[in-house]
């Protein structure tokens, strides 16, 4: 199973949590914080052995949210390290699936 997260259009922490929770089908009680992200990612990996999460648009995500983006991305890297889930990282957005915002 592969899940795609194109983070190129993420403007802030709130947008990130809304987008990720929908794309990864997190439960309704998701807490919209990094602890809740970790808990739900871990549950996702445990319930879907061999899952692959494709992170795209990392350059744009980091440029808009430099400090916070590092912490969020770290959750995914730790997931890969601890659970065996595979996390693919792309600075660009080859899928073009990211959020679009009016300038």
Annotate each PLM feature.
Residues 1-28, 44-103:
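N-terminal intrinsically disordered, low-complexity segments enriched in P/E/S/T
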């Amino acid at each position: 199973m592969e899940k795609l997260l194109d983070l190129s259009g993420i403007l802030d922490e709130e947008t990130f949590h809304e987008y990720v929770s929908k794309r990864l089908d997190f439960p309704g009680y998701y807490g919209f914080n990094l602890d809740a992200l970790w808990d739900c990612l871990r549950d996702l990996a445990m319930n879907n052995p061999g899952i692959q999460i494709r992170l795209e648009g990392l350059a744009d995500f980091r440029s808009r949210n430099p400090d916070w983006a590092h912490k969020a991305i770290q959750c995914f890297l730790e997931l890969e390290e601890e659970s065996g889930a595979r996390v693919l990282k792309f600075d660009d957005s080859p899928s073009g699936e990211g959020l679009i915002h009016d300038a």
